[in-house]
C-alpha cells in the first residue's frame, strides 16, 4: 500500500480535486485497512478543522474504528463529542462503532450508558453489549440483558451468549443455551455449530454425535469451518476412526488447508502413520501446506528418509526459516538420532527464540552430549537470552560433572527458578546420578512443595546409590505424608527393585498385595517388576502366575519370564516361552529377548535350539547380533565341548562386531573347563595383550596348566602376576560370625 500523504499534501489534494466526502471516506478506509491508523486520525482531525468539508456519519464511524484499533481513549472521546454536537449519533452504525470502541477500551460503564441512549438498538448493538459484558467479567448483567430482550429470534444473539459462556468457562450453560435455542426453533448457523463442537471432549461424545446429526440435517456439512470443527471434536473425544470418516465423507471442494491441518495434527497426536498419507493427499489437491502443516507432519515422521523429504519440501516452499518449523525440524532429526542434522538446522537460523535454544539443548541431552548442551547454554547466556525452567530441566537431565552441576544450580538461583517444583525435582535427580545422594536428600528436605515426581526421584536416588533401606524409609514417609500422594507404577517398580537388592521376599509379597488392593496390577511396568522380583527371590512359580495374570504383555514381560527360567536353570521352559511368544505374534522379540533365550540355552546345554535361534535373528527378525549374543553362543558351544566351532564363531564375530574381550573370555572359560591347553594358551596371549593388568587371565591360564599337570608352568604364570604389577582381588565374606 502507498504510504499516506503528509498532512499538507492531503489537504491540498482535497482542495485541488474538489474532493467529496466519498473520496475522504475512501482515503480513511484505505489508511485504516493498511494499518496506518495514526495517519488516518491526523487526516480526520485536519479535515474536521477545515471549514470547506464536514465529516459525515461514515467519516465519524471510520474515525471511531481507528481510535478503537489504537485504543486511543482521548481521541475516541473527542470523536464521540463531535458526533453528539453534529447530531450524528442517530445513525446506528455510529452508535454501534462507539459501543465497539468502549468494549475495546474495557469501559463497560460507558458502553452501558451509550447503549441506553440508543432509541432502537439493532442486533449488532445487543450482541456487542452481551459480548462486552462477558469479556469484561459482568456475566450476571449479560444474562440480565438477555432475559429482558424483547426479541431473541436472531441467531447472532444466541451465538453471543453461547460464545460468552464458553469463554467464561460455563460450558454446561453453553450447551443448555444451544438446546434451548433448538427447542425454540431458532436456526443454527455455521458459527454456532463450530462453537458448540469445540466444547465437546471425551465425556460428551454422545452430545457431539447429536450435533453432528443436526449439522447434516441443517445442510452445513458443506461448510469448511463446521467440518473442521467436527473432525476436531472426534479427535478430542479420542475417536480417531470417526474423525477420519468425516474427512473421507467431506466433499473435496469443501476441504481447505485447515481441514488437512486438523486431520494431520490429530493423527500425528495419536502417533498414526496415516498422517503422512493425508499430507500426500493435501499436496495432490494442490493445497499449499502451512507452517502448522509441517510442524504436525514432522512430528509424525518415523522414517529418516521421509523426514528428509519433508524438510526438503519445507525449504522449497520457503518455510524452513519459520522459527516454528525450524524447531520442529530439529526435534524431528533428534528423534532419528541425527544430531548433526539438528545442529546444522540450528546454526543456519538467523533468528532463534527460546524454544530453539531449548530444543538444541534437549537434542544434546538425548545424545548424552552434556558438554555440547552446556556449550549451547553458554552461547545463549552470552547473547542475553533468558532461560526458563525447560532450559534448566534439559541441562540437568544431561550427564554433567559435579562442578558444572553446581554452576548450573547457581544460575538457577540467580534467575529465581529454584522454587519451581520441576527444577527442584531435576536437581534432585541430577545430584543422585552424580553420586551426591546427600545433596539430593538435602534438596528434597528443603523443597517446600513435593509431588510424586519428587518422591520418585529421591527413592530411586537412594536405591541406585546403594542405599536401599533409606529408599524404603522414604517410601514409608510417602505413604504417611500429610498431603495424600498415591505411588504410581514407577514408584512401585522401584520399590520392587529394592526388594530384590535386599533379598526381601516378604516385602515383595507385601508390595504385590498393595498393588492388588489399589488396582494397579493392570500397569505392565509393575507386572514386569513383579516377575523379576519373584524370580530373583527364588520363587519362579510366582513369576509365572504373575505373567499369566497380566492382561497386557510387552516385550519386557516376555523377556523377564525367559530370564527367570534362565536364572533358575530351566532352559527348556525358557525356549518354550520364546516359541509361545513367536506363535502368538503379538510382540516382536528384541535384542534383549535373544540374549535371555541364548543364555538359557547355554546354561541348559541346548546346542541345537541355541544355534537355530541364533541363526534366525537377522534373517527372520531383523535383529542385529551384538556382543552378548556372540558371547552366549560361544559359551554354549564351549560348554558342550565344541571348541573348534566356538573358535570359528569368535572369528566370525570379529568381522561383525570387531574383536571384543567378552567373546574371547567365553572361549577362554571353555578352554579352562575342558583343559584345552593349546587353544587356551593362544586365547590367553590375546587377552593379555588386551587386558594387561587383569590378573584373572593369569589365574585362569595357571589353572589350565595345573589341570594338564604342568606344575612348573602353572607356578611361573602365578609369579608373572606380581611381575606385571597386577594383584588378584582377595576373597572375603560378607557374613559376620
Curated annotation (Swiss-Prot):
PROSITE patterns: PPR. Residues 663-737 are annotated as: Type E motif. It holds the Pfam family PPR_1. Keywords: Repeat. One of its GO terms (biological process) is RNA modification. PPR repeats lie at residues 20-55, 56-90, 91-121, 122-152, 154-188, 189-222, 223-253, 256-289, 290-321, 322-352, 353-387, 388-418, 420-454, 455-485, 488-522, 523-553, 554-588, 590-620, 626-656. It comes from the Eukaryota. The keyword Amino-acid biosynthesis does not apply. GO terms for molecular function: RNA binding. SUPFAM superfamilies: TPR-like. Belongs to the PPR family. PCMP-E subfamily. NCBIfam families: PPR. PANTHER family: PENTATRICOPEPTIDE REPEAT-CONTAINING PROTEIN, TETRATRICOPEPTIDE-LIKE HELICAL DOMAIN-CONTAINING PROTEIN-RELATED. This is Pentatricopeptide repeat-containing protein At3g49740. The gene is PCMP-E84.
Amino acid at each position: 500500500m502507498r504510504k499516506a500523504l503528509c498532512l499538507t499534501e492531503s489537504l491540498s489534494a482535497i482542495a485541488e480535486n474538489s474532493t467529496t466526502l466519498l473520496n475522504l471516506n475512501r482515503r480513511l478506509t484505505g489508511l485504516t485497512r493498511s494499518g496506518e491508523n495514526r495517519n488516518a486520525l491526523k487526516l480526520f482531525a485536519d479535515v474536521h478543522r477545515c471549514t470547506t468539508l464536514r465529516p459525515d456519519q461514515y467519516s465519524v464511524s471510520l474515525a471511531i474504528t481507528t481510535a478503537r484499533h489504537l485504543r486511543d481513549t482521548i481521541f475516541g472521546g473527542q470523536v464521540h463529542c463531535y458526533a453528539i454536537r453534529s447530531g450524528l449519533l442517530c445513525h446506528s452504525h455510529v452508535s454501534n462503532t462507539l459501543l465497539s470502541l468502549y468494549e475495546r477500551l474495557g469501559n463497560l460503564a460507558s458502553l452501558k450508558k451509550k447503549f441506553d441512549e440508543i432509541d432502537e438498538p439493532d442486533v449488532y448493538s445487543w450482541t456487542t453489549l452481551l459480548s462486552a459484558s462477558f469479556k469484561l467479567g459482568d456475566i450476571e448483567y449479560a444474562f440480565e440483558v438477555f432475559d429482558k430482550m424483547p426479541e431473541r429470534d436472531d441467531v447472532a444473539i444466541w451465538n453471543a451468549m453461547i460464545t460468552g459462556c464458553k469463554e467464561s468457562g460455563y460450558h454446561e450453560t453453553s450447551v443448555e443455551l444451544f438446546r434451548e435455542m433448538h427447542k425454540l426453533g431458532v436456526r443454527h448457523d455455521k458459527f454456532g455449530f463450530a462453537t458448540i463442537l469445540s466444547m465437546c471432549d471425551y465425556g460428551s461424545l454422545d452430545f457431539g454425535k447429536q450435533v453432528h446429526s443436526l449439522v447434516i440435517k441443517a445442510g452445513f456439512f458443506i461448510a469448511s469451518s463446521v467440518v473442521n470443527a467436527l473432525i476436531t471434536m472426534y479427535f478430542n473425544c479420542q475417536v480417531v476412526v470417526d474423525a477420519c470418516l468425516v474427512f473421507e465423507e467431506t466433499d473435496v471442494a469443501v476441504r481447505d488447508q485447515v481441514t488437512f491441518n486438523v486431520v494431520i495434527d490429530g493423527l500425528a497426536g495419536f502417533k498414526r502413520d496415516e498422517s503422512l498419507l493425508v499430507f500426500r493427499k493435501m499436496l495432490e489437491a494442490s493445497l499449499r501446506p502451512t507452517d502448522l502443516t509441517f510442524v504436525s507432519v514432522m512430528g509424525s515422521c518415523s522414517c529418516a528418509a521421509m523426514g528428509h523429504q519433508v524438510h526438503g519440501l519445507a525449504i522449497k516452499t520457503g518455510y524452513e526459516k519459520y522459527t516454528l518449523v525450524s524447531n520442529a525440524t530439529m526435534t524431528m532429526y533428534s528423534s532419528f538420532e541425527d544430531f548433526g542434522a539438528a545442529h546444522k538446522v540450528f546454526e543456519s537460523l538467523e533468528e532463534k527464540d527460546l524454544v530453539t535454544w531449548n530444543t538444541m539443548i534437549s537434542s544434546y541431552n538425548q545424545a548424552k552430549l552434556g558438554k555440547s548442551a552446556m556449550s549451547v547454554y553458554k552461547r545463549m547466556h552470552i547473547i542475553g537470552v533468558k532461560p526458563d525452567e525447560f532450559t534448566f530441566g534439559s541441562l540437568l537431565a544431561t550427564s554433567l560433572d559435579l562442578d558444572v552441576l553446581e554452576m548450573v544450580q547457581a544460575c538457577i538461583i540467580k534467575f529465581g527458578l529454584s522454587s519451581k517444583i520441576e527444577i527442584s525435582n531435576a536437581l534432585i535427580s541430577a545430584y543422585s546420578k552424580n553420586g551426591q545422594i546427600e545433596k539430593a536428600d538435602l534438596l528434597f528436605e528443603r523443597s517446600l512443595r513435593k509431588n510424586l515426581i519428587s518422591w520418585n526421584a529421591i527413592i530411586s536416588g537412594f536405591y541406585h546409590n546403594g542405599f536401599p533401606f533409606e529408599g524404603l524409609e522414604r517410601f514409608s514417609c510417602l505413604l504417611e505424608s500429610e498431603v495424600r500422594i498415591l505411588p504410581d507404577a514407577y514408584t512401585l517398580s522401584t520399590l520392587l527393585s529394592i526388594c530384590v537388592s535386599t533379598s526381601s521376599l516378604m516385602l515383595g509379597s507385601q508390595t504385590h498385595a498393595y498393588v492388588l488392593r489399589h488396582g494397579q496390577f493392570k500397569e505392565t511396568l509393575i507386572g514386569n517388576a513383579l516377575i523379576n522380583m519373584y524370580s530373583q527371590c527364588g520363587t519362579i512359580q510366582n513369576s509365572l502366575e504373575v505373567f499369566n495374570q497380566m492382561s497386557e504383555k510387552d516385550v519386557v514381560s516376555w523377556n523377564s519370564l525367559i530370564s527367570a527360567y534362565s536364572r533358575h536353570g530351566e532352559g527348556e521352559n525358557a525356549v518354550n516361552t520364546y516359541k509361545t511368544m513367536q506363535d502368538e505374534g503379538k510382540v516382536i522379540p528384541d535384542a534383549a529377548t535373544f540374549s535371555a533365550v541364548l543364555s538359557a540355552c547355554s546354561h541348559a546345554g541346548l546346542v541345537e535350539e541355541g544355534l537355530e535361534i541364533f541363526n534366525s535373528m537377522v534373517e527372520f527378525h531383523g535383529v542385529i547380533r551384538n556382543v552378548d549374543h556372540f558371547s552366549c553362543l560361544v559359551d554354549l558351544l564351549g560348554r558342550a565341548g565344541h571348541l573348534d566351532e566356538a573358535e570359528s564363531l569368535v572369528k566370525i564375530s570379529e568381522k561383525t562386531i570387531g574383536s571384543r574381550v567378552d567373546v574371547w573370555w567365553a572361549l577362554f572359560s571353555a578352554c579352562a573347563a575342558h583343559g584345552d591347553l593349546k587353544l587356551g594358551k593362544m586365547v590367553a596371549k590375546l587377552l593379555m595383550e588386551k587386558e594387561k593388568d587383569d590378573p584373572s587371565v593369569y589365574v585362569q591360564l595357571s589353572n589350565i596348566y595345573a589341570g594338564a599337570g604342568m606344575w612348573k608352568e602353572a607356578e611361573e604364570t602365578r609369579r608373572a602376576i606380581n611381575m606385571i604389577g597386577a594383584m588378584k582381588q582377595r576373597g572375603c565374606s560378607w557374613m559376620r560370625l
